[in-house]
UniProtKB/Swiss-Prot annotation:
Organism, scientific name: Oryza sativa subsp. indica
GO molecular function: protein homodimerization activity; sugar transmembrane transporter activity
Compartment(s) of residence: Cell membrane
Cytoplasmic side stretches: 28-42, 93-101, 151-164, 211-261
Protein's name in the database: Bidirectional sugar transporter SWEET1b
Quaternary state and interactors: Forms homodimers.
Keyword Protein biosynthesis: no
GO CC annotations, alphabetized: plasma membrane
PANTHER family xref list: BIDIRECTIONAL SUGAR TRANSPORTER SWEET1, RAG1-ACTIVATING PROTEIN 1
Pfam families xref list: MtN3_slv
Keywords carried by this UniProt record: Cell membrane, Membrane, Repeat, Sugar transport, Transmembrane, Transmembrane helix, Transport
Catalytic activity: D-glucose(out) = D-glucose(in); D-galactose(in) = D-galactose(out)
Amino acid sequence: MEDLAKFLFGVSGNVIALFLFLSPVPTFWRIIRRKSTEDFSGVPYNMTLINCLLSAWYGLPFVSPNNILVSTINGAGAVIETAYVVVFLVFASTHKTRLRTLGLAAAVASVFAAVALVSLLALHGQHRKLLCGVAATVCSICMYASPLSIMRLVIKTKSVEYMPFLLSLAVFLCGTSWFIYGLLGRDPFVTIPNGCGSFLGAVQLVLYAIYRNNKGAGGGSGGKQAGDDDVEMAEGRNNKVADGGAAEDDSTAGGKAGTEV
């Protein structure tokens, strides 16, 4: 029964995390249509990519047995985020933006390669799991914490236009699903970061309940832009994971903060 419950929460986490990973698609369709990244930033997608790669590696059977559902969603997330980064490179609005994105992508590849090779060639058993788990956990916590700037903005402006309800709900549900999955599997490297994600998602929902009837100072087009940025969490999210990643606030890419395990 416990294994079945773990499986069901893992599947639930996969479905919700996939939604968070795909949330920036409208932004990238706009980039492709206009053939320019405009003021959007590629930083969130590179950060979500390294998180997905490390989490997917951690979930592999020879690193962490019985965590294949962690690998499936983060493997899918890595493919999606790679596509985002490629689009960013192709349609970068300036040469500087392209070089910056390329440099970050190279750093992501280097860090992942280092962790993977060291864990594969130099470590075994629990030592391998420890290295990969710590690396994935640190990245996941950083991604989950990234929406703090948006939460601060909501409190400052008293406007939830900066924090879409469905995205906040998805972050909470995703974090909670993976938190319970980690508890059932007795895996601290899944439980700890997603416990943080669940808590921060709950805080976002509380803020939404408090300020949902207020337009605040962020009404109008400014609020719309900030709201779009927040959808790009994913990834992240999360988690997962804000829908645009505007340069004015790269930290909104909590995505796969909110979505990663």
